[in-house]
A protein has these predicted regions:
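Short, low-complexity N-terminal intrinsically disordered segments enriched in polar/charged residues
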Residues: 12, 17-54
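Short beta-strand edge/turn micro-motifs at domain boundaries
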Residues: 125-150
Length: 150
């Protein structure tokens, strides 16, 4: 009887396991962030807005330092700050450090350090936290918070 139970359990696992798939099973959320999302900011982010937007869910939840949460359509969330940064002379950003922490098979937190490049050879460091979720079998950024660079 015990062997039958174990055989049935093993058979069930073998049959069901292909149905349990996280986003893009070929790469982790951290690899996706580092190799797909990060490079889009390195050269011509203004020309790559549509490609950058494919990495976001339709809305982004921003976690404010005052404890507030706000939900914004991703296009507005991305383009409004980019326009403001451009007016300040911002040119591009380079992902210089990153730590990804898997929360579960479908959710990963990503802490980042970026080097921002401005006109006149000025650089600045900025840091942020992103929540990346598997949505419809694709990794998407769903949440963001500025973080102190330490």
């Amino acid at each position: 009887m015990r062997n039958i139970y174990h055989t049935l359990l093993l058979t069930g696992v073998v049959l069901v396991s292909p149905l349990i798939v996280s986003a893009d099973s070929d790469q982790t959320a951290g690899d996706w962030f580092k190799n797909s999302y990060g490079p889009l900011w390195a050269d011509t982010p203004y020309q790559d807005i549509e490609a950058i937007l494919t990495h976001y869910h339709s809305e982004i939840v921003t976690h404010g330092s005052d404890g507030s949460l706000s939900t914004t359509p991703s296009r507005e969330w991305l383009t409004a700050p980019m326009d403001s940064w451009r007016e300040e002379g911002w040119i591009r950003a380079e992902l210089t450090d990153m730590t990804a922490t898997s929360i579960n098979a479908a959710t990963t937190g990503v802490m980042t350090v970026w080097t921002d490049y401005y006109a006149g050879d000025v650089t600045e460091t900025s840091c942020g936290w992103y929540l990346v979720d598997a949505i419809n079998n694709e990794w998407k950024i769903t949440h963001y918070a500025d973080t102190p660079c330490s």
